[in-house]
């Protein structure tokens, strides 16, 4: 072979070898037990884990692998191109020493961006981050929960104020002097120290959380904020709802995220199972980033305040959400949308389909713009929340307390809601108040007391083939108050309708 041919081939070979070496480096696995991590859960592995992540990231990425065993750690800071992999039988147990989550990091806590204790697993501005495997992440939350209950009690006993601040509370005050806080939210922030979310990826892209089991979260469990392209698949979340209850231990709460897919998850928690959020009040409007392009499918929700919830922190807006093929069994509510004056934000283009509900302790459906019952009527502005273009279909339910309600506000009625192909049995029916353009098509609401459908202060009601399988004697199935305008009724039994 001539020299002129050999030289390019040599350079090509070197180039190919370089690419192969880069691929190998990218896929390198770091076995934490072989690297010296204590698999008996006695000695903290925090420093070793984070040092290994830094090393892997400096080499282009890799997998941080935990074989069978129990590993004690505090905050883990993920980097780009890092996979945290827990083998079946591996338990990553997090410290319950509050100081272990210093220094403060930037995070969004209950819809407000602040400096606070680090989430248990955290990343900032990272790309391609994965948590995977059949192992268990244990947040060891009991001490955090007891602190929360004790702090609430102290604040209540001292007229809504903390009498003194401890070290961490004073650090929080010093770190957040410029934080803008609405009057409505000030009582919540009086704690001056805040339980960290279990997992918060902040301003990250290409996130995957799959197959792991997550238990005993100190606060919200999976809480990506300002992220794009998030996949959460096959995850089991168990936070106790009693004996003792883990307060505010929501399951999955994307906040101001885009392109989120949640599927095949099992969730039983001490608050809402899945909640879609986008910031609180002025702080949320300042960032102005909606939570949008969200799919939730094939999930089972057991104990929890709500099955799938939107709000109440939704000041940046929530748009284009599809919820399908889910079971709610034993939650307090099924589908719940909540907001209040002062929030602002638009919730729109929501689709709910093929849902089964059972043993719902409260309402199957809630659409509530009047979450703050003390608020007063005000001119429409950026502070005014909006619910519109929301459609629900193919829902069945039994053993339900109330079918639910719509509650708009005088200056902004809830608008453009439809309910179709439903068969629900409950103790009490459905009430709509301060709403426009509400449609029911092929809906059976069977109740034990009162009307199945009750409308007040509404404009534009369309009823097609609505009924009760067991009408109550001397009780209308549909009650329409005199302040309701523009009602269209077809294919209904007129003897079961009362128009006042």
Model-derived features with residue positions:
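Extracellular/periplasmic carbohydrate-active domains that bind, remodel
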Residues: 24-500
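Bacterial Sec-dependent N-terminal signal peptides
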Residues: 1-30
């Amino acid at each position: 072979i001539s020299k002129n041919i050999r030289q390019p081939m040599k350079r090509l070979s070197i180039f190919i070898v370089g690419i192969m070496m880069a691929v190998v480096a990218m896929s390198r696995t770091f076995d934490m037990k072989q690297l010296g991590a204590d698999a008996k859960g006695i000695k903290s592995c925090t420093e070793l884990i984070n040092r290994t992540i830094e090393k892997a990231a400096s080499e282009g990425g890799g997998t941080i692998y935990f074989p069978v065993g129990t590993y004690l750690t505090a905050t883990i800071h993920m980097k780009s191109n890092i996979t945290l992999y827990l083998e079946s039988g591996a338990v990553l147990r997090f410290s319950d020493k509050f100081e272990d989550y210093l220094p403060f990091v930037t995070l969004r806590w209950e819809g407000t961006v602040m400096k606070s204790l680090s989430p248990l697993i955290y990343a900032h501005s990272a790309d391609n981050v994965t948590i995977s495997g059949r192992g268990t992440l244990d947040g060891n939350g009991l001490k955090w929960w007891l602190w929360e209950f004790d702090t609430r009690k102290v604040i209540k006993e001292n007229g809504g104020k903390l009498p003194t601040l401890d070290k961490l509370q004073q650090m929080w005050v010093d770190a957040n002097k410029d934080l803008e806080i609405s009057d409505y939210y000030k009582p919540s922030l009086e704690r001056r120290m805040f339980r960290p979310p279990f997992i918060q990826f902040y301003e990250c892209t290409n996130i995957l959380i799959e197959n792991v089991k997550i238990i005993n979260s100190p606060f919200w469990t999976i809480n990506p904020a300002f992220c794009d392209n998030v996949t959460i698949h096959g995850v089991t979340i168990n936070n106790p709802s009693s004996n003792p209850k883990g307060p505010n231990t929501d399951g999955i709460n994307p906040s101001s995220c885009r392109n989120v897919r949640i599927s095949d998850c099992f969730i039983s928690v001490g608050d809402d199972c899945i909640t879609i959020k986008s910031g609180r009040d002025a702080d949320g409007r300042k960032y102005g980033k909606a939570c949008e392009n969200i799919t939730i499918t094939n999930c089972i929700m057991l104990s929890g305040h709500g099955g799938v919830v939107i709000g109440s922190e939704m000041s940046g807006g929530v748009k284009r959400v599809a919820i399908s093929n889910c079971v709610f069994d034993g939650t307090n509510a099924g589908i719940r949308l909540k907001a209040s004056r002062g929030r602002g934000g638009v919730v729109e283009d929501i689709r709910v389909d093929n849902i089964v509900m059972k043993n719902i302790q409260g309402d199957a459906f809630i659409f509530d713009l009047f979450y703050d019952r003390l608020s007063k009527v005000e001119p429409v502005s950026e502070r005014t929340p909006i619910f519109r273009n929301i459609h629900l279909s193919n829902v069945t339910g039994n053993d339900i307390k109330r079918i639910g309600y719509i509650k708009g506000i005088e200056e902004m009625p809830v608008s453009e809601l439809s309910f179709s192909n439903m068969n629900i049995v409950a103790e009490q029916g459905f009430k709509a108040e301060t709403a426009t353009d509400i449609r029911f098509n092929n809906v059976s609401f069977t109740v034990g007391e009162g009307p199945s459908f009750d409308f007040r202060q509404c404009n534009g009601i369309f009823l097609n083939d609505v009924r009760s399988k067991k009408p109550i004697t001397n009780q209308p199935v549909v009650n329409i108050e005199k302040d309701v305008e523009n009602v269209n009724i077809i294919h209904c039994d007129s003897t079961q309708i009362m128009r006042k």
